Amino acid sequence: MSKSILALALAAIVTPAFAADYQTNLGPMPLDDETRQVIGGRGEATVSSDGKTMTVKGSFQGLLSNATEAHIFASPAAGIPGKPIFDLDVTKSTSGTVSGNFKLNSAQAAALRAGKLYIQLNSEKAPEQYPWGPKGNLWGWLFPAHETVGQDVPQQDHWFIPQLDTPSS
């Protein structure tokens, strides 16, 4: 009995202070007349982080052309395009996986906790650049793990960013 209590106490001490899980639904980038014919698909990804590292695992399907690359971007705020900070491993197909393991500096860890990191997946036919930022195929902001709506639950549009309270940096 006392060994069990000691083991639990040690586990509590060595558990990272910022251990957390994050998730995103990957949906199409904003569509316009140019992109409507070449952008499509869906995906999801999860991130586990201890505040010093993060592990990304995800999948996608239904792209209209093969995936070419995927990145983690840092943005000034959720919903605003940013700059790539990490390259993800991605299956070069219309369906597959994204993954990666990364060391985080303090600014990147704070950005993750504040909902300022997102995943973007690019494909062969998706245009490369909008005037306001990089074009891609699918994207999704990483937020703390949360309930998601089912397929038959109405949403505002093709996808949306959930309104969650995120910790300040």
Model-derived segments and spans:
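Bacterial N-terminal signal peptides that target proteins for export
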Residues: M1-L6
